[in-house]
Amino acid sequence: MNVLSSICYGGDYNPEQWPEEIWYEDAKLMQKAGVNLVSLGIFSWSKIEPSDGVFDFEWLDKVIDILYDHGVYINLGTATATTPAWFVKKYPDSLPIDESGVILSFGSRQHYCPNHPQLITHIKRLVRAIAERYKNHPALKMWHVNNEYACHVSKCFCENCAVAFRKWLKERYKTIDELNERWGTNFWGQRYNHWDEINPPRKAPTFINPSQELDYYRFMNDSILKLFLTEKEILREVTPDIPVSTNFMGSFKPLNYFQWAQHVDIVTWDSYPDPREGLPIQHAMMNDLMRSLRKGQPFILMEQVTSHVNWRDINVPKPPGVMRLWSYATIARGADGIMFFQWRQSRAGAEKFHGAMVPHFLNENNRIYREVTQLGQELKKLDCLVGSRIKAEVAIIFDWENWWAVELSSKPHNKLRYIPIVEAYYRELYKRNIAVDFVRPSDDLTKYKVVIAPMLYMVKEGEDENLRQFVANGGTLIVSFFSGIVDENDRVHLGGYPGPLRDILGIFVEEFVPYPETKVNKIYSNDGEYDCTTWADIIRLEGAEPLATFKGDWYAGLPAVTRNCYGKGEGIYVGTYPDSNYLGRLLEQVFAKHHINPILEVAENVEVQQRETDEWKYLIIINHNDYEVTLSLPEDKIYQNMIDGKCFRGGELRIQGVDVAVLREHDEAGKV
């Protein structure tokens, strides 16, 4: 679903922070900058409803009309991101409570319990009032529900949540005996006889039952999703043709975005990579993840910053050109919109030093606004990209419930973190410009040739069969250490590790050897010696062949990496955390077998992605280096640079440092 027929460009707009004369100035500046969409009213509950049941829309009417008169459309917020002071005063028990029993007070934002009944009642009234007010306004193009759900309060442990949790558990398990079985409550004498004996996993003397903790992750995710769906139901009823979304936050642990994405019309998300980290690999990974949530549907980058944020210890600015560069890198991975937080930099409040499209002091030479305007004018030329897709032959399994489970306490290695392991594999694809999707273990895998499963600790019923069929039909499955260990309740799969994946991989893991942070071992393969860290599996072969063996320690000579033929395909098991050199070589060998090639052969730190429509192919090339690079395009093609409009024959192409090229591909006859 496209919000506009062009690339969306703009940012969060908070006119309630400014006098009316600034509104007109803002609209003119937006017009000059090429802004066509702003997110409006996100934190305006206290302004729209200054007292219980009393609504004031006059100011918002005027703002929307001014913007529309200047060609700016509205992504209208439902204003539910922060409850007003009058609501908190009237319903003090609506404030969230943490695991230690501490009440989180008013004075910040997101200070509400998602299961408070009066919160839900008041949200319904507010959202319906806003929807009815603006349902026929031609400026309305999209709904922005709440804001960054769970960003600050992902779990509440109050009595309202306790009651709701018991109800959720009863619906899930039906009987208390089934819950006891699934949670393993005979351990440490935790057995329950009645539902009302169960509480949220509050602060306890020592380790909490991990099955209970895992279910509380699920419960809170469902509780917050229910809030979103409460609003969406009203918006769909009143404005059935207006797309509804809420802004995600990439690899945000508390919310299962694969589940959430089924309920939004378009994925939108917020991204704030640190300029100090250089090459924005995790930003690229999150763009690919966000695109994958709705099976490749283009998304909108709802928030980024023009220069610097305010919430890190040290908030360095993006150097000149980097905001533009990273924006194009986002478009390259499937974005149909580039938005910012925020339009005008705040004068007061907690984010007054957070960068914006219009800084505190604006003159004709201001670098930030100049770059904002340049990008806005360029994006007007890229309407052709709207709706185009990315085709990938490689997928990485990413599973939120697996993430929750693998990072619960009481593991062999309690410093293991899921995202760095996923990123280690992704990094090798990124460096080689191999397009990649993210999938769940239960998703349809038939269009992929290679599927990578980093630390798939949890394998739920049926997921192993999906992976088994993928391999049997000719795919390559690459599985990392500490995979196939538990079921959906964090109960160990009996019969040996890696549980239901043993037959696919042709191995048996006898023991785990977690490494201290300073320990480095070596692995041998037929092409050299490589470092490995973090973990070693003691592997016994059950039909697989070793691709690499450990050099040191008491398990020297035992397999570290294995390959097993299964059906028409193969299962590769990586029983350690090898260095980038080894992972890269391993993946290159697999890709060569499947004839998976980079889109272009390019210099280091040059990012290339291809977006496609039924008619055209578009190459988006980003030079992250600060120096010029030269690359070769096929000489039998004609290319059009969509930014400057020039056409040229393939061959040598030069791209300046910190610069981009967006090329439409033609054949000799001028067609795809």
UniProtKB/Swiss-Prot annotation:
Catalytic activity of the protein: Hydrolysis of terminal non-reducing beta-D-galactose residues in beta-D-galactosides
pH dependence as annotated: Optimum pH is 7.0. Retains more than 80% of the activity at a pH range of 6.0-7.5.
Superkingdom assignment: Bacteria
Residues engaged in binding Zn(2+): 113, 156, 158, 161
Temperature dependence (free text): Optimum temperature for the activity is 70 degrees Celsius using ONPG as substrate. Stable up to 70 degrees Celsius. Retains 80% of the activity at 75 degrees Celsius. Kinetics of thermal inactivation and half-life times at 60, 65 and 70 degrees Celsius are 120, 50 and 9 hours, respectively.
Enzyme Commission (EC) number: 3.2.1.23
Active site: 148, 303
Example GO biological process: galactose metabolic process
Applications: Has potential for enzyme application in low-lactose milk production during milk pasteurization.
Catalytic class of the enzyme: hydrolase
Annotated function: Hydrolyzes 6-bromo-2-naphthyl-beta-D-galactopyranoside and o-nitrophenyl-beta-D-galactopyranoside (ONPG). Possesses a high level of transgalactosylation activity. Hydrolyzes lactose in milk.
Family per record: Belongs to the glycosyl hydrolase 42 family.
Name assigned to this protein: Beta-galactosidase bgaB
Species, as recorded: Geobacillus kaustophilus
